[in-house]
A protein has these predicted regions:
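N-terminal Rossmann NAD(P)H-binding glycine-rich loop of SDR-like oxidoreductase domains
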Residues: 2-22
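Glycine-rich NAD(P)-binding loop of the Rossmann-fold in SDR/ketoreductase-type enzymes
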Residues: 60, 91-102, 149-150, 208
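Active-site Tyr-X1-5-Lys
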Residues: 143-169
Length: 330
């Protein structure tokens, strides 16, 4: 039996599908309020019966974690909170850091292998030969978002478990492209691209297909002597190039007008003050705006060296759209 946390999300739901394809018995730990739209639509898309064993519980509750792990040989820890609102700092810490600490301790106690879905947010600040790699040094916590710090501290808990003898695999995906609970997480980027954008920021980021993340998380966990982080990046693209793909594939509005950085940073400064006072009128945060202008480039050489060939961003978008159309017609 294999346990998956966070199976309601993009990565977790895809890992469940890949495990079921491989004939594994899968148990899913979920909160009472869990929404399984993402997993249900994938099961429908792949024409697979729902043979998942669902167990109600929470990673914040060590007792329910221990009960969920009973009889399991492995856990894929995908559950995490993503938010860039300063008001969510405490919840980010409780979910991402304390929750992961609980998972690590439960795995140590039950002698269960752990596969941890981390993030590029934990990759160090200093590029090596123009790219951020698994070896890029982390210079400082200063200026980092609460989300970034929560993922870093969570990952440190995983490394702590490793030092205590836990068998661990860590993957660090970029912006994950794939079907999920529409209107949440990175599906918002897909829906925005499908609608089309005229204006675009000057930043860039690394993108990866959710299927690649699931396949690599599973395959890496089966390898001997797998150490450290593993960046999962299909392509590095500017946001202009990324949203242009939607125009080329689906006929969406083509991004054609660059938004200058200077006036946006003025908005960022004002928004930061309002956020501290909890008076911000916008859903978009100052951190969202800042990230739109960061030029992030990541290396996938570690995965290329083991022979893995990533899907392209175009393949990821076409796949996501196929599932999206199925959901609309459901």
């Amino acid at each position: 039996m294999i346990l998956v946390t966070g199976a309601t999300g993009i990565v977790g739901s895809h890992i469940v599908i890949e495990l079921l394809k491989a004939g594994e018995k899968v148990r899913v730990l979920h909160r009472k309020s869990a929404n399984f739209i993402a997993l249900a639509q994938l099961l429908k898309f792949h024409q697979m019966p729902d043979s998942v064993h669902y167990v109600e519980g929470d990673i914040s509750d060590p007792v329910s974690l221990s009960e969920a792990l009973a009889g399991c040989v492995q856990v894929y820890h995908c559950a995490a909170m993503v938010s860039f609102h300063p008001s969510d700092a405490r919840q980010l810490h409780e979910t991402n850091v304390i929750g992961t600490d609980n998972v690590v301790n439960a795995c140590l106690k039950e002698n269960v292998k752990l596969v941890y879905i981390s993030s590029t947010a934990t990759i160090g600040d200093v590029p090596i030969n123009g790219e951020r790699t698994e070896e890029s040094p982390w210079v400082s916590d200063k200026g980092k978002s609460d989300y970034t710090l929560s993922k870093r501290y969570a990952e440190l808990e995983v490394f702590r478990g490793m030092q205590e003898g836990l068998d661990v695999t860590i993957v660090n995906p970029g912006v994950i492209l794939g079907p999920g609970n529409w209107g949440t997480s990175s599906t918002t980027i897909f829906l925005s691209g499908l609608k089309g954008l005229t204006f675009y920021p000057s930043g860039s980021n690394g993108f990866v297909d959710a299927r690649d993340v699931a396949e690599l998380a599973i395959s890496l966990s089966k390898k001997e002597n797998v150490q450290g982080k593993h960046l999962l990046i299909g392509e590095n693209l500017t946001f202009k190039d990324f949203f242009t793909r939607f125009h080329e594939l689906f006929g969406s509005k083509k991004p054609s007008v660059a938004i200058p950085k200077a006036p946006v940073m003025s908005i960022v400064n004002a928004l930061s003050i309002l956020e501290k006072l909890r008076l911000s009128p916008l859903k978009m945060t100052s951190e969202n705006l800042k990230s739109a202008y960061r030029k992030m480039v990541y290396s996938n050489q570690k995965m290329v060296d083991i022979g893995y060939s990533f899907r392209t961003v175009n393949e990821a978008l076409l796949y996501t759209n196929e599932v999206y159309k199925l959901r609309n017609n459901a």
